[in-house]
Amino acid sequence: DFQTWQLGQMGFDFIKVDAFTPDNLPEVRNSYWNKWRRPLRPAERARLLSHGMAWDWVAENGPALIIEDDAVLARSVPNILENLEQINDIEYLSLEVRGRRKLLSKTAIPIGHGVASHRLYLDRLGSAAYVLWPNGAKKLIRRASKGAVSLDGIAQWATSVKCFQADPACAVQLDMATEYGLSAPIESNSTTEKNAAPKALTIAQTCRLFLAQAHKIWRLCRYGLVAERRKIELRPEFFDI
């Protein structure tokens, strides 16, 4: 498949997780899924459980690049991963861009090949390509054990994790490739949009959503002097497709 080919071209040794799908979700009590701020679609539930297996591996074995099967990587990613071994105090680094603005620190740490790492305070979309360290993995596992979460916007709910963002972005999902001037090598098979719309919010979920919005405003105010809300650039010349 595409991802096996891409990782082979980059010289990566990798482990392919046998991901869950909406058709083979295990039995999980409804009270677990209902603890998020809105109903999660079957595809979102499958993604959470699949990424959870990767988090378990990182927590036990060490830092790793976690990517979904439709993530396209910049050619510099292998060298950037080597450079990250010399950088401390990062627990999660998003490589991806998906069109939305993010709240990023104004200062940055160079990580090679014209790419810098900014502290990431708010994010709404994207979990197709990220680097995760054991401390970050343990925090994500601990948070997810308390109740279901959406993988989109990890920096928004995993506030104890030291999250960073690569800029310019080093990855993009296939369904967004053409938006950034890239030619998609294969057709995207993203499943999230193909699922039926979720049910109406419960009273508890409405309260959680309100609190989440209030927390977002609080973070915007707290980091307003040291951060800026902007879109992440992606440079097509960094990619081989």
For every predicted segment, state its role.
Residues D1-I67, A71-I241:
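An acidic/histidine-cluster motif and surrounding catalytic segment
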